[in-house]
Amino acid sequence: MDKILIIEDDVEINTLLTDFLKENGYVVYSQYDGLHVLDFLHKEKIDLIILDIMLPYRSGDIILADIRRQFTIPVLIISAKETTQNKIDLLRLGADDYITKPFDMEEVLARIESNLRRVQFENRSAA
């Protein structure tokens, strides 16, 4: 079973994503501020991260940069920021995908599946 970490401070959105992904067969972990994400990633093998950009204490772009320095886990950004430049900046910083809020749950699921397929293909090619 693939493991997904959701880092989203909005409890309603976090719960909605968690419940939906569990119903679709994923093991889901939740964080609400990302303060301890690196410690968590060193302890638990995660297959994909869903990361909000507007978080308390540390912004998602800083968390993304920290993740990229140490891990190759796919990161799917969810954000209310709709500007093209914001999307470009985050993709260049290391995000693998970007979805604008409000989002369609089926689109989120399709993007997760797509990113996980890509990683599985890359792992098979490297073996």
Where are these regions (language model features)?
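N-terminal/domain-start alpha-helical segments
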Residues: 1-123
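Regulatory hinge/linker segments at domain boundaries
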Residues: 125-127
